[in-house]
């Protein structure tokens, strides 16, 4: 069987397990100054800064942080372990408050976090708790909620630990806490959920439909919304599967739309207006009265197929008319 990708928890353990070695560590291991120099020249050791070495390949973000005299933190750590973050460009580095602000060379694009961390981490990376706490302050509200959803969904922190983070944040961030939902499986789902909430629409998340499988949202009881991203919907085979699922949902009386993740993030107002238009256009036809009858009729059809009885496939639709 092909090996599955490491989980966020496994990625976190791997990053935390990186050892940044000091000269004393190397001497204790029996390496003389000459052997250390030779090991660096031969590529067996990497010198990050004076008195800081690593013995194996490490992520570039860790190299940049340690060379700067700091540690990987915030969005960078979360991105490295597979937690959703919206912005991915800059390296986020936690700098010790006592360190001179001009002492070490730092990447021009780095985002520097000064101040004390509240939990113990490693010499090259802050604790996950501190990284999550910093990420709330470092993002827009919607992106922060999506990150928190992802952290909880992957069970990297408990709800109690997230609550403890909010107790340390200024009052203006407290409004975000009730909006967190660990059922969200991706950042686009979080953004879509908040969009639906802003429209005042009723919705359910991660709904399992007979013959269809699990869908991201069922809105107003009849509209299925699937948030399509390249990560999970790329390739013709996946496209075929998606379209067959849409047809199966149609037999149950559901209308399906598939907004792209790039549009959910980059054109939210247009997506919002499109969803609103679909609800207004179809709601009177397949909404409160007709959709339940369509779904009952489709379920009867599914039962008939399983039992070999071809009866009354469209009776529910005709009765609704």
Predicted regions and their residues:
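Short gly/ser-rich loop at a beta-strand->alpha-helix junction or flexible surface loop bordering the NTP-binding
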Residues: 1-169, 176, 280-321
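Surface segments flanking catalytic/ligand-binding clefts of nucleic-acid enzymes
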Residues: 152-321
